[in-house]
């Protein structure tokens, strides 16, 4: 059976603000199944934001597991991410899940993969999914050459990715946190 897939998730950290945004398109093979999916969410008392790329059902399973890890570790992002990655790598059922998570709190931004990787990216810029390279290129150019806010960079870069990538649309969901975690 074909997987639901294709998306773009972008996270930018600038100043005291971190933002994660994503498009709303869900694709099955060559067909757009839904155009307004929410692939970015607030977790753990609204102190963590997370987005996913990959299989939709798989990602929802991982969101639930990640939120449980956040609860278990009192919202400590890095510890929860490492514990989820351990489970993901070693659990026979979880290993089959095909998704990548981008997560952030007021202090750290991370990529969590099914290979058990927890990666803190350079320059706190995360771009995942089929439109990730387009969004990353646009965001880097905007970060280096403008004074735009993190939210404005995410909006503009995702719009550019949506104009280029056939698996990405311009129906955006954007969540932001400042240094107080709000």
From Swiss-Prot:
Q: Pfam families in the record, alphabetically? A: Proteasome
Task: Report the CDD domains cross-referenced here.
Answer: protease_HslV
The record's comment on protein family reads: Belongs to the peptidase T1B family. HslV subfamily.
EC identifiers of the protein: 3.4.25.2
Q: What is this protein called?
A: ATP-dependent protease subunit HslV
- Is Metal-binding tagged as a keyword? yes
Q: What's the subunit arrangement here?
A: A double ring-shaped homohexamer of HslV is capped on each side by a ring-shaped HslU homohexamer. The assembly of the HslU/HslV complex is dependent on binding of ATP.
Q: Name one GO biological process term.
A: proteolysis involved in protein catabolic process
* Active site per UniProt: 7
Give the UniProt subcellular location, in the record's own words: Cytoplasm
Q: How is its activity regulated?
A: Allosterically activated by HslU binding.
Which positions in this protein are listed as binding Na(+)? 162, 165, 168
The keyword Protease is assigned to this record? yes
Q: Which reaction does it catalyse?
A: ATP-dependent cleavage of peptide bonds with broad specificity
* Record keywords, A-Z: Allosteric enzyme, Cytoplasm, Hydrolase, Metal-binding, Protease, Sodium, Stress response, Threonine protease
Question: What Gene Ontology terms describe where this protein resides (cellular component)?
Answer: HslUV protease complex; proteasome core complex
């Amino acid at each position: 059976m074909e997987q639901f897939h294709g998306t773009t998730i972008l996270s930018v950290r600038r100043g005291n603000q971190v933002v994660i945004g994503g498009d709303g398109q869900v694709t099955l093979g060559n067909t757009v199944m839904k155009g307004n999916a929410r692939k970015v969410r607030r977790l753990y008392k609204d102190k963590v934001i997370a987005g996913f790329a990959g299989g939709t059902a798989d990602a929802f399973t991982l969101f639930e597991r990640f939120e449980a890890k956040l609860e278990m570790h009192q919202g400590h992002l890095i510890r929860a991410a490492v514990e989820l990655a351990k489970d993901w790598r070693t659990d026979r059922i979880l290993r089959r899940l095909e998704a990548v998570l981008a997560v952030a709190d007021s202090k750290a931004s991370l990529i969590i993969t099914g290979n058990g990787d927890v990666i803190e990216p350079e320059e706190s810029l995360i771009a995942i999914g089929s439109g990730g390279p387009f969004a990353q290129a646009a965001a880097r150019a905007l970060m280096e050459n403008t004074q735009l806010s993190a939210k404005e960079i995410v909006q503009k870069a995702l719009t550019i990715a949506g104009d280029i990538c056939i698996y990405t649309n311009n129906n955006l969901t954007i969540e932001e946190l400042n240094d107080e975690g709000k």
